[in-house]
């Protein structure tokens, strides 16, 4: 009997040894393109890398930075698969035949506004009549957001002067070179208040709903790389929630990705907090409103930036947030 038991044990061990070693889940390497340069507002993606959130979904992400128009061409041609892009860039690109598509909106509120010193008494959009407004240039989200706000208030280009000042909004305003400046809500207003200035801020989002930044891929990925796209969307959602729940942790992680970010920079910490207020943290597909895309398309057509109307509903997919 003992001999039979011994033989049975030997057989079990032999069978166990013959089993193939458990395989590690396949890792897909992708590049996630972010615009401009490393910035605290990209904290969720730094968190997703450092905390292994992308890895959890079988994805190894490398970050790259560059000009939005150049990057969207790479994604549209399927030379690369993912980027963070503005909603207007998605629409403009699709109108030119690039098959890019938003799969997850990042912002619930359009992140642009108009800031002025309290002494200028610009408390509503109609107060901009006769004023000089500084902005980086006649392009991008600043320009589009301002024109949308002005048009909604019944103003035309003849009612104000737009002055291209580069990214010097804070200095241009406090030295009274201009009456108001177009800003990112989470950036320049924080700097101005930190320097002790009392300001008024007109939010574009309070006037009308426009689509902001999104996770963007291409139609080939949506149809042929469903699991990968779902993984990127799920990882982004989780990273946003983790960052919003612990901004101090996210800030500390961001220091590994942003050169010269100080250990304790109160302005940059506040920029992160203000950014979080603008994010879309919910995944309810009802949050993806076609109206936001249609409104943006109307603005682009009115400005002459788009030459033809497209089907706005085809610019985004909510299949990965359901």
Language model region names:
Residues 24-156, 161-165, 170-175, 179-186, ...:
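Short, glycine-/small- and polar/acidic-enriched structural segments
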Residues 223-305:
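Secondary-structure end/capping motifs
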């Amino acid at each position: 009997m003992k001999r039979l038991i011994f033989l049975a044990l030997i057989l079990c061990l032999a069978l166990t040894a013959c089993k193939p070693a458990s395989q590690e889940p396949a890792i897909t390497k992708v590049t996630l393109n972010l615009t401009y340069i490393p910035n605290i507002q990209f904290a969720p993606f730094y968190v997703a890398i450092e905390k292994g959130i992308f890895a959890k979904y079988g994805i190894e992400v490398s970050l790259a930075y560059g000009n939005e128009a150049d990057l969207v061409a790479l994604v549209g041609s399927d030379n690369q698969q993912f980027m963070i892009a503005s909603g207007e860039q998605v629409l403009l690109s699709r109108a030119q035949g690039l098959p890019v598509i938003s799969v997850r909106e990042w912002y619930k509120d359009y992140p642009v506004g108009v800031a002025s010193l309290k002494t200028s008494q610009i408390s509503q959009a109609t107060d901009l009549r006769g004023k000089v407004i500084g902005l980086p240039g006649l392009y991008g989200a600043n320009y589009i957001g301002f024109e949308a706000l002005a048009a909604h208030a019944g103003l035309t280009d003849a009612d104000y002067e737009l002055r291209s000042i580069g990214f010097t909004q804070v200095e241009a305003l406090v030295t009274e070179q201009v009456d108001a400046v177009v800003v990112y809500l989470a950036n320049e207003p924080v700097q101005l208040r930190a320097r002790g200035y009392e300001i008024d801020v007109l939010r574009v989002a309070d006037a009308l709903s426009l689509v902001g930044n999104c996770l963007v891929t291409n139609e080939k990925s949506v149809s042929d790389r469903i699991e990968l796209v779902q993984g990127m969307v799920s990882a982004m959602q989780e990273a946003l929630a983790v960052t919003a729940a612990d901004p101090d942790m996210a800030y500390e992680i961001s220091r590994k990705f942003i050169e010269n970010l100080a250990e304790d920079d109160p302005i940059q910490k506040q920029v992160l907090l203000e950014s979080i207020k603008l994010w879309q943290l919910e995944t309810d597909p009802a949050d993806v409103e076609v109206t936001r895309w249609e409104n943006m398309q109307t603005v682009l057509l009115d400005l002459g930036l788009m030459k033809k109307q497209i089907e706005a509903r085809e610019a985004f997919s909510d299949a990965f947030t359901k």
